[in-house]
């Protein structure tokens, strides 16, 4: 765990405490992370589930969750109001009965708790699929007015003797083959996310080509997306298209892309598609010694994040802090 980065996030949360919903309140990993959070006063866990079952699950694995708020959809006093609001949000696509049935599930119920202001953010996916976490967010939280898509970013951290290396990579998890305009949005959102984690973003639009050395539709896509991103955010350091070696090696960057404000010093990487992105971040994780935090969902009106179903309690704890830091 990148202790320095997380301590900075915790210090920020201490100044403005948040409430986070966990959609799977009986999961042992969620309970362990919640017990750790309850030791502080800066991030209050809300566990969804039957109160007796949640407490029994915590007792079985030996975690003290005294003080945690537990909310059971089946006995929630404001359920009628929640159903009414969800019907309005779905705009005729779901009946009241269908909404009520959906709200008996932690993913929909938790998302509506965020929508109604009971919680500031949500973390799910310990047992739910990514689709089952993202779908309610798209339907109920929706994207920000300036955003057309939900995208994602991984924060990659490698601890060093003197300092940490912190990078941002997107989109490695959500958009399979983004268009030029979607890549513009992905780049700008990743840059915003990078700033939250102390990165001064230098954004590289990656390709197998550097400054026209290669030809093809994907090269054109990255070059055009980069040009549009630069026009949309002239104050950001953005450049491309470029190969990864030109992006990270000052020597290669100077040779292949002289005069670039990014080449050789990039720290925020935009991949042409999910294949490249997913492979890229996992190479950095498995061979480069980086810890990967994410996927962090970008573009929504409130922070909703997805865990890997193979996550451990430490990863739940870390992602809870990251999610709350974005609230």
PLM-predicted stretches and their roles:
Residues 1-263, 267-327:
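Anion-binding alpha/beta catalytic cores of soluble intermediary-metabolism enzymes, centered on
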């Amino acid at each position: 765990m990148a202790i320095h980065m997380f301590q900075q996030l915790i210090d920020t949360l201490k100044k403005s405490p948040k409430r986070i919903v966990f959609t799977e309140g009986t999961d042992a990993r969620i309970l362990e992370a919640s017990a750790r959070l309850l030791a502080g006063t800066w991030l209050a866990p809300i566990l969804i589930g039957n109160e007796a079952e949640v407490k029994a699950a915590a007792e079985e694995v030996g975690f003290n969750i005294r003080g945690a708020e537990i909310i059971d959809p089946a006995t929630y006093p404001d359920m009628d109001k929640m159903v009414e609001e969800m019907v309005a949000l779905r705009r005729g696509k779901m009946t009241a009965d269908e909404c009520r049935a959906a709200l008996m599930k932690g993913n929909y119920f938790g998302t509506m708790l965020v929508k109604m202001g009971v919680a500031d953010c949500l973390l799910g996916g310990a047992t739910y699929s990514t689709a089952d976490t993202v779908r309610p967010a798209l339907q109920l939280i929706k994207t920000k007015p300036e955003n057309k898509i939900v995208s994602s970013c991984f924060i990659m951290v490698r601890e060093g003797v003197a300092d940490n290396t912190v990078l941002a990579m997107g989109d490695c998890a959500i958009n399979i083959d983004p268009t030029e305009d979607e890549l513009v949005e992905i780049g700008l959102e990743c840059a915003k996310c990078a700033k939250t984690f102390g990165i001064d973003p230098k954004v590289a639009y990656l390709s197998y080509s550097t400054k026209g050395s290669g030809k093809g539709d994907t090269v054109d896509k990255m070059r055009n997306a980069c040009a549009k991103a630069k026009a949309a955010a002239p104050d950001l350091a953005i450049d491309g298209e470029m190969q990864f070696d030109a992006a990270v090696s000052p020597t290669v960057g100077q040779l292949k892309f002289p005069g670039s404000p990014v080449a050789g010093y990039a720290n925020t990487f935009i991949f042409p598609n999910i294949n490249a992105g997913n492979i890229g971040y996992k190479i950095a994780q498995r061979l480069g010694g980086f810890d990967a935090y994410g996927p962090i969902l970008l573009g929504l009106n409130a922070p909703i994040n997805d865990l890997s179903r193979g996550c451990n309690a430490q990863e739940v704890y870390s992602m809870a802090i990251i999610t709350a830091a974005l609230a």
